[in-house]
Amino acid sequence: MSKKIIDVFKEKEKVNIGYIVAGFPSVDFTKQFLQNLDNTALDMLEVGIPYSDPLADGKLISHASFLASEAGVTTDTVFDLLTEIKDDISKPLIFLIYYNLIFAYGIDEFIKKCKKANIKGLIIPDLPYEEAFEMSEKLRKNEIALIPLVSVTSGNRIKKIVSQGDGFIYAIGSLGVTGSKQVDLPRLESFIKEIRKVSNLPVSLGFGIKNNDNVNTMRKYADGVIVGTSIVDFTFKNDVNYTIQKINELFK
């Protein structure tokens, strides 16, 4: 469990969470952005590790991930960068990474590198439930949260899915991949109520949140709001100051 993530939810009335693809549009851009994270309205940041088959990601994020991979960005590239600049970053960083990458890397070695790079949580979209208990136990020993993903279609599996989770619950507010249209508000409200019945963890809503109006609407229902696709879209300009400005407008 990551105390730093828990503390953010205790301190903030509503938590702003963003997402970037590591190494896109360049490793230097990622470095500069992370070193200026304190100048953004974000309270924590998901860092996506480039992967060739990102099943949860829409076209835009998949394309950014593909371009980063093509440019030679690997899991080790990201670890090296974050370990180098970890003292410059005061806000919690969370990896969004696919299980195949962790498995190929070696689970214990991967967790060891996460701790060294000061990673506070992991979101693993393709983690098999059967592997979640062991993964969660190993992460807890290293004060890293395993953040569970639940969707509006999870139904009576929600309790089972969140049972191994820490930090917060990532509630998927759309029926598709990242960037998809959200489900209607009554269904969303009912979905979050179902989550709260089975867990005391804070709930953050993601997928389909594209603009400031969306952000402010979702704040009425959830403890945190997650924006990915729009932020990755900003990074295509390859301008750190522009990206920060647009993020601050998004979360104002």
PLM features per residue range, with description:
Residues 61, 71, 158-197, 239:
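Glycine/Thr-rich beta-alpha phosphate-binding loop at enzyme active sites
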Residues 57-65, 229-252:
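C-terminal helical cap(s) of enzyme catalytic domains, especially alpha/beta-barrels
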Residues 70-72, 118-131, 145-153, 158-159, ...:
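Catalytic beta/alpha-barrel core
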Residues 44-53, 119-123, 128-131, 171-180, ...:
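Glycine-rich phosphate-binding active-site loops on the catalytic face of alpha/beta enzymes
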Residues 44-45, 49-51, 60-125, 245:
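Active-site beta->alpha loop and helix N-cap motifs at the rims of alpha/beta catalytic domains
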Residues 1-20, 86:
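N-terminal amphipathic alpha-helix/helix-capping segment at the start of soluble metabolic enzymes
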Residues 27-37, 153-163, 205, 209-225:
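Catalytic cores of alpha/beta
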Residues 16-20, 45-47, 93-97, 122-124, ...:
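Hydrophobic faces of well-ordered beta-strands that scaffold small-molecule active sites
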